[in-house]
Amino acid sequence: VLEACKQLEKEGFEVTYLKVDAHGLVNFADLLHYIKCDTILISIMTANNEIGTIQHMQAIAETAKEKGIIFHTDAVQAVGSISFNVDAMGIDAMSISSHKIYGPKGAGCLFVRDGVKIQSIISGGKQERGIRGGTQNVPAIVGFGKAIEVAVRDMSINNKKIKSLKEYFVKRLTESIDDIYI
């Protein structure tokens, strides 16, 4: 998303980058402060792959909706790790990538809620509702579908294993290093 924002700036759009707190959460007061009457999009990373932060998506989505702003989330790091429902959370657009759940590289998914208008990214045809021209990579799409199926099926087991590893890691660190803060 950062590179897309940089490109938008080159095209003349004003982009505001919000800071996060020590836990990696977007400061909601800052978000409200920086929303302007001409703000058209809020894009927030659902989950941070480095520190494990999961944003408060529903509150951000509700604010965006109240102000008539499209809400996009980059859920690449979240898919297969947390359960979420785009309708319940009020998400207007969401991007995910196959390779993060052991699917084929080069396949991705962009959810766009009905009624949200977006500009074509690759001209030349009516594929993908006119958003992208060209022939779809059917084997990669099928592989992505299977990867999602497996990720959802195994999510609970994988999360339990990760939690156990985290607890072991924290225990070993706290036993080995005096005055450690985790």
Label the predicted regions:
Residues 1-182:
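Pyridoxal 5′-phosphate
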